[in-house]
Design a protein with these regions (language model features):
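Boundary/linker segments of alpha-helical solenoid repeat arrays
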Residues: 1, 27-44
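A surface-exposed partner-binding patch
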Residues: 64-200, 249
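Residue-level signature for tetratricopeptide repeat
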Residues: 7, 51, 55-58
Length: 255
């Protein structure tokens, strides 16, 4: 039961893990021979203490995000436009971005090709943004999540948005596109990997279709590969996500 408890804990199911750690203690198990993390404790009592701290936190976070999912509109958004203030200073135009991200002007045929390959309808808000610029690194490269607690991540880094020009490495169907992250890095198959982060693949931003189906309006989530692929809800839709992006303090000082 100790192995099962560890597996649950590493899958961000601390509330369930707590029960199994307690069962292990009742059976007389005091220490764990091998742990999955170098800095993890070996004492079962220490694991129980950890789980007792994190179990209520996990329950609170899951409840909060479940309510957001239930309230949000899952029907596809139509006629989406971005405010000028949102677009102002959004992109970062360096040599790498132009070479590896930025594609040719996006067409309806490009969107249809990507949708067919990935099996999902792209949000109209994403298409609207790609018609303005077909992918690129972001100058507004931070997003504040809705779940604000002093024990969890509040600000999420976003390095760039993947476009629909498959000749670019960092595009939805490019060399380091959505399928690459799902098939090679084993990210959960819940939708489309839409944005990278500064971790180089150890956490990603996804369009999550798990509660709306492939033709619905996906929400935007953060997935932490290093944290057992923990999913954190960010925004009801892609437009709200882009609207909420902001630059680092250093970039703000440069304006």
């Amino acid at each position: 039961c100790i192995r099962y408890a560890m597996a649950l804990y590493n899958s961000n199911r601390e509330d369930e893990a707590l029960k199994w750690f307690k069962r292990a203690k009742e059976k007389g198990i005091k220490e764990i021979d091998e742990t999955s993390g170098r800095y993890y404790p070996k004492s079962v009592d220490d694991w129980i203490k950890r789980a007792e701290v994190w179990a209520p936190r996990r329950i609170e976070k899951n409840k909060f995000e479940k309510e957001l999912r239930e309230k949000r509109d899952k029907k596809p958004m139509l006629n989406v436009r971005f405010d000028e203030e949102v677009l102002k200073g959004l992109w970062y135009h360096d040599e790498f971005s132009i070479r590896e991200y930025l594609g040719k002007p996006a067409t309806d045929e490009d969107f249809e090709k990507v949708e067919k390959e990935l099996g999902y309808c792209l949000p109209e808000s994403y298409k609207a943004l790609m018609r303005i610029q077909n992918g690129g690194e972001l100058r507004k490269n931070n997003f504040e999540g809705p779940f604000k607690r002093n024990w969890t991540t509040g600000i999420f880094n976003v390095t760039g948005v993947y476009g629909v020009d498959s000749s670019r490495k960092y595009s939805l169907c490019g060399e380091f596109g959505s399928k690459f992250w799902i098939e090679e890095w084993k990210y959960p198959d819940i939708g489309i990997a839409i944005c990278g982060t500064s971790s180089g693949g150890h956490d990603m931003i996804f369009l999550d279709y798990s509660d709306c189906g492939p033709e619905g309006e996906p929400c935007v989530v953060h997935i932490d590969q290093e944290g057992g692929y923990e999913i954190t809800y960010l925004a009801d839709n892609f437009k709200d996500f882009v609207d909420g992006l902001f630059p680092s303090f250093d970039d703000e000082d440069d304006d």
